[in-house]
Amino acid sequence: MSSGKSARYNRFSGGPSNLPTPDVTTGTRMETTFGPAFSAVTTITKADGTSTYKQHCRTPSSSSTLAYSPRDEEDSMPPISTPRRSDSAISVRSLHSESSMSLRSTFSLPEEEEEPEPLVFAEQPSVKLCCQLCCSVFKDPVITTCGHTFCRRCALKSEKCPVDNVKLTVVVNNIAVAEQIGELFIHCRHGCRVAGSGKPPIFEVDPRGCPFTIKLSARKDHEGSCDYRPVRCPNNPSCPPLLRMNLEAHLKECEHIKCPHSKYGCTFIGNQDTYETHLETCRFEGLKEFLQQTDDRFHEMHVALAQKDQEIAFLRSMLGKLSEKIDQLEKSLELKFDVLDENQSKLSEDLMEFRRDASMLNDELSHINARLNMGILGSYDPQQIFKCKGTFVGHQGPVWCLCVYSMGDLLFSGSSDKTIKVWDTCTTYKCQKTLEGHDGIVLALCIQGCKLYSGSADCTIIVWDIQNLQKVNTIRAHDNPVCTLVSSHNVLFSGSLKAIKVWDIVGTELKLKKELTGLNHWVRALVAAQSYLYSGSYQTIKIWDIRTLDCIHVLQTSGGSVYSIAVTNHHIVCGTYENLIHVWDIESKEQVRTLTGHVGTVYALAVISTPDQTKVFSASYDRSLRVWSMDNMICTQTLLRHQGSVTALAVSRGRLFSGAVDSTVKVWTC
């Protein structure tokens, strides 16, 4: 082995030489000056002028044992063994040939496991450049809301500042501190080694490694071209790891150099000397121009084939999009045909309904004319026109229920604001008191004797003493909101989801007597008349015997769910979700008429009866009230004064009270 090669390899065997011998023939110029703290600074300038490195060479006075091991840096390289002659497959000549790689193209050792990047400072950094959370030099310093600077990772992991105990929130990068840290001098990673077996590992200066110190900000530039960087032989993976500066010497002695025509079938493997001899006799060497032309043609064919594949893929994608668009057009066309058929069917149904309505109107006109000719209707009485006489204002939400205490001329109103207001309807016409106690919307009110019962969305019934307007009892009545209440024969009935509960009234207590079942929806309407209870649930009205609590009859509706019920001396009336009012004969239970006119759900019904006539009042989602004469089943008046849906009705002494979503209660009289 030559003396030059021995000098190169002495560093592995513990020889005296620690620095690489500069090659004068390359034209490299070296200058040494003194940097900070009298550290020697060596500037190496290559002759071609392509790159210049300013590096601080380690001196005993500038070496430091301070080590910083970030946990998220690149992997460190394994220790380098002594290079030796080994199997290789590339020669120095092939490095300079067109078919091989350049000497500058090297392969780094594979990263087997993640380890912290070695960081050993040439001089002790100032404590002002250390994070108070991790006690190490700042890495990616940021300013937080408290004004202090920490590593970004530390600031994100810690909840509070260790100085003033303020919650940490990153505000902005601390560029000034980052630049100061970038000016610190460190030892090249290839000049450091692990000291001890702790975790995270601590690094120290390796006297056999790279002797240069560099600025932290220029670390990657230096380490990417460091002569002490471990590499592998590019020809054979079985060759041991080498230093970059020893790669060229290794390639001259490699025993695994392959023929440049190995891809065509040549099986030669040898060293540099046999490689040159083989080229003179290789059968592929004389055909290299033809082989190269063939390779070029194959390459052109591959490129053309790839272009054709791309064109085919593009055409397929366009075909797929075109098919999708055709499918969409077909679906759209089918949908339009369906809509057209549906509209045509609806128009036909509407036309038939209009014809039925016209026929019904003709029948009613004929009936009215006949009654006029017989003198039954009598003369028109302007005093029967209902007018709005006043408005009670005070609730902070929609009014859902009304109830009148005729003994004291008091009106009770329940609202979404969870309160019940007591109104004087005789003298002051003002709110006497606001009753509070429910935790939900007040949905139902009922009076029995001198007690007021209120049902709410909070599933409870509260008993109030009307004399002093105080709460006297609270009963957990249902598992769902209490929708409606009615009393009769000292018994209270409460309606909820699929259930009606029967309560015996004992003073201020309610004793559960029975639960009426067989209901399939919300019980939104309850009316007690004479000895019968009428309940509305979904599209049925059930009639119960109050004494036996048995269901004795069921009426079926066809206009949506039942929302309201009223009973007169001769008729049973119900309002439905589908804007209709159905009328049955109370004796025969036969439906006699369906009243139309509303354009919204009929929420409430009320009855005013006199010896001469009976009037039914209906309240609807369409913000209107309608007055119906039960003598001829026609609407005699429409009342429009509310600004929202009318939800509740109550009557007393010929007066009508209406509550609405506009949070008001209006008073109507003739």
Swiss-Prot record:
Alphabetical UniProt keywords: Apoptosis, Cytoplasm, Cytoplasmic vesicle, Disease variant, Metal-binding, Nucleus, Phosphoprotein, Repeat, Transcription, Transcription regulation, Transferase, Ubl conjugation, Ubl conjugation pathway, WD repeat, Zinc, Zinc-finger
WD repeats: 394-433, 437-474, 477-513, 515-554, 557-594, 597-638, 641-669
Phosphoserine: residues carrying this PTM: 61, 88, 91
Molecular-function GO terms, alphabetical: ubiquitin protein ligase activity; ubiquitin-protein transferase activity; zinc ion binding
Transmembrane parts of this sequence: none
UniProt record similarity statement: Belongs to the WD repeat TRAF7 family.
Protein name: E3 ubiquitin-protein ligase TRAF7
